[in-house]
């Protein structure tokens, strides 16, 4: 093992749930889900650098809003990796450039942790298998393994049963966050207060979808986000974002991602997504707005 860590950097993409079906809690309090997850070309970045002593730092527009101690998933990823190696490691610094909003339904913490795990494997244990790395990611949270893979997939069970997604067309989208956090635990508790006859059943999946229009039509007809209504009840600003997006001509499908508060609009093309994003930035400069491509 080298006595000094090499300098490395990894992108941590935003996760978007195109649909999220949720069942009632099981005996241990976990909710079964089925979800089609895709990943955006916008996200955070994690940097690994040599250091005289172990350190974790944050930067970026949302860097001052995240915990720097053991509650941060990047720190926990490092701790889990050290336990897996079982021996001393050279000191290093992890720097999280936080560009995604906090508690936003974009899997940011899990994606950051996945990026950190990849960097640590590259620097310290390149022989560590993908399965071992995925087990570490899964131990950090329900989205951990999915965000480590960072490609379109179907998640079922508690989020741990992953399978390839059907072939998807190019999906251009606009992500919008109203600047209000939507804590996952609170949204699930609000969900549990209701009645949910549909449960987490997986809809029949087409083999492939030829266009963004076809994908949006199928998603609107066959799927939903079961956490959207309880999240809107808790945070009305989410409902405001959804209403605005649904009133825009470029929007093929409008939905909340994960437990919110970020919402997305699928658009027919990159040009339409760009136009929608620019208009929203002018209309609502207080909102976080990003045009992106999903895959």
From Swiss-Prot:
Matches recorded under InterPro entries: GHMP_kinase_C_dom, GHMP_kinase_C_sf, GHMP_kinase_N_dom, IspE, Ribosomal_Su5_D2-typ_SF, Ribsml_uS5_D2-typ_fold_subgr
Keywords: ATP-binding, Isoprene biosynthesis, Kinase, Nucleotide-binding, Transferase
GO biological process: isopentenyl diphosphate biosynthetic process, methylerythritol 4-phosphate pathway; terpenoid biosynthetic process
Family stated for the protein in its record: Belongs to the GHMP kinase family. IspE subfamily.
Binding site for ATP: 101-111
Positions of the catalytic residues: 15, 143
PANTHER family the record matches: 4-DIPHOSPHOCYTIDYL-2-C-METHYL-D-ERYTHRITOL KINASE, CHLOROPLASTIC
Protein name (record): 4-diphosphocytidyl-2-C-methyl-D-erythritol kinase
Primary role: Catalyzes the phosphorylation of the position 2 hydroxy group of 4-diphosphocytidyl-2C-methyl-D-erythritol.
Record EC number: 2.7.1.148
Any single Pfam family the record assigns to this protein: GHMP_kinases_N
Biological classification of the source: Bacteria, Pseudomonadati, Pseudomonadota, Alphaproteobacteria, Caulobacterales
